[in-house]
Amino acid sequence: MPKSEIHPKWYPDAKVICNGEVVMTTGSTKPELHVDVWSGNHPFFTGTQKILDTEGRVDRFMKKYGMGSADSATSQETKEAKESDK
């Protein structure tokens, strides 16, 4: 016989909330689950090429490894300035 009162409370109709909307219900140990991305707005499932850039991480990576960035004109000016200094 399993011990009583050691298991968490089970919510069979837990709401999954994304951007303030209830997107689905599922079973969970919490009554509400707040998510940033789910299959309804994920680029892989929607077929869109949207970069979810949180706190400029993509731009920092692009600048660090010289792969261009959103401000490609600025990076071109910087390269030209470095070449003229030589």
From Swiss-Prot:
Coiled-coil boundaries: none
Positions with biased composition (Basic and acidic residues): 77-86
GO CC annotation: ribonucleoprotein complex; ribosome
Keyword terms: Ribonucleoprotein, Ribosomal protein, RNA-binding, rRNA-binding
Pfam name, any one: Ribosomal_L31
GO terms for MF: rRNA binding; structural constituent of ribosome
Keyword Ribonucleoprotein: yes
Record-level GO BP terms: translation
Residue ranges, annotated region (Disordered): 66-86
UniProt KW RNA-binding keyword: yes
Assembly and interaction partners: Part of the 50S ribosomal subunit.
Protein's job: Binds the 23S rRNA.
Family the entry assigns: Belongs to the bacterial ribosomal protein bL31 family. Type A subfamily.
Name of this protein: Large ribosomal subunit protein bL31
Provenance organism: Prochlorococcus marinus (strain MIT 9515)
